[in-house]
Amino acid sequence: MIAYVDASVLLRIALRQADALSEWRQIEQGVASALITTESLRTLDRLRLRAKLPDTEVASRRAKILELIASLELAEIDSVVLDRAAQPMPTEVGTLDAIHLATALLWREQMRQDITLATHDTALSIAARAHGFHVVGAAPT
């Protein structure tokens, strides 16, 4: 399976959280926005401060995040992505989710291949389904 992966999926795996994506091992080619690096590392830093994680735990989780990101094809956030993300959407979508969705839409158009969208985010999954994506990770709406 070719899948666009957002930070919610990557973080549940890297942080060993409950309900990690069961389809993760089925992803043969993972695609993500370069935004995934910033989102993932900022989340880890917030967790470090809130949960007072020991340095060894932070280092281990950071290494896992970077390992997972290295396995993905990262799409840069350029003016084309930002312009697409700024366009009206069929459902309510926040700024970061709009960037993820625009990246997935542009990848699908440019590669002319189907791509599954992997997310645990409800709003992103609804918007992705409205754009004709098969979605894994989020409960059907």
Label the predicted regions:
Residues 5, 32, 76, 95-98, ...:
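Short beta-strand scaffold positions
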Residues 26-30, 87-93:
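A short glycine/serine-rich beta->alpha loop
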Residues 42-49, 105-106:
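Short glycine/serine- and small hydrophobic-enriched flexible loop segments
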